[in-house]
Amino acid sequence: SITTNKIYFGADTLPAQHNGSVSVTGLYAKKDFRIGGLHLNHRVLLQFSSAQEVVPVPLASVYLSYFYEFNVVKGVLRLQIGLDGRYNTKYAGFGYNPAIGQFYNRREYDEDGKLLEVGGYPFIDLFAAAKWKRMRIFVKMQHLNDDLIGGRNYFSVAHYPLTKRFLKVGFPW
């Protein structure tokens, strides 16, 4: 998409207007494989912003879901067990100002003058889901890889870490 004279919140968290056009170009690919009860679902988004300081986007975002699905009791109880994974390449990302309740285009640098970035960290969930007649139940260990890969450098927004590992149980029907 192409926008002109885009209004955004700058690094100082004040409204700013970009003079000129900003283009965000993306390419989305989806490919699912099924081999018997094994499901391999893939989603990839490649994107480019002509003005990262105005519209920061990661170069690539990937979502993978690998699970095995089978009948425990045919026609009555069906079960899925698998992993979900999400990954974004590193990019400048956004900051959040709670005083104004607004995300802003953050530009922060470390002591060496290197731009502080978010992303570059895989987020993996382990899940089991069952369908019994009309009722569904799921158990999910979100952020399974917490503290296992890359220390604790997992942020989606600057200074706001992603959730730690936790167990989630649900009964939708």
Predicted regions and their residues:
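Exposed, low-structure sequence patches enriched in small/polar residues
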Residues: 1-173
